[in-house]
């Protein structure tokens, strides 16, 4: 399963672990994804999405209806 946020598109990033001796090994920085249910009043149903915490803040700010409209316009749901 892809670790991708439905709303923001955040994905894992690649970086390095750096030891005290300055040795570098590859690592992944994973987005903080959560499965959340959102009540959509206009459709009278729950919508379950995998979203990042940044997306939760966006949904709080603009509303779930606006976010779903944007996702539908992009053709993602």
Curated annotation (Swiss-Prot):
Keyword Lipid biosynthesis in annotation: no
Keyword line: Ribonucleoprotein, Ribosomal protein
- Which GO terms fall under molecular function for this chain's record? structural constituent of ribosome
Pfam entry (one): Ribosomal_L28
Q: Which region is the signal sequence?
A: none
Protein family membership: Belongs to the bacterial ribosomal protein bL28 family.
Entry's Gene Ontology BP terms: translation
State which gene encodes it. rpmB
Taxonomically, which superkingdom? Answer: Bacteria
What is the name attached to this protein's record? Large ribosomal subunit protein bL28
Q: Which GO terms describe its cellular component?
A: cytosolic large ribosomal subunit
């Amino acid at each position: 399963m892809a670790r991708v946020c439905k709303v923001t598109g955040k994905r894992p990033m690649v970086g390095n672990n750096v030891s005290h001796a300055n040795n570098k090994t590859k690592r992944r920085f994973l987005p903080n994804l959560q499965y959340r249910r959102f009540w959509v009043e206009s459709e009278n149903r729950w919508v379950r999405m995998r979203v990042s915490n940044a997306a939760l803040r966006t949904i709080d700010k603009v509303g779930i209806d606006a976010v779903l409209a944007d996702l539908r316009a992009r053709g993602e749901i």
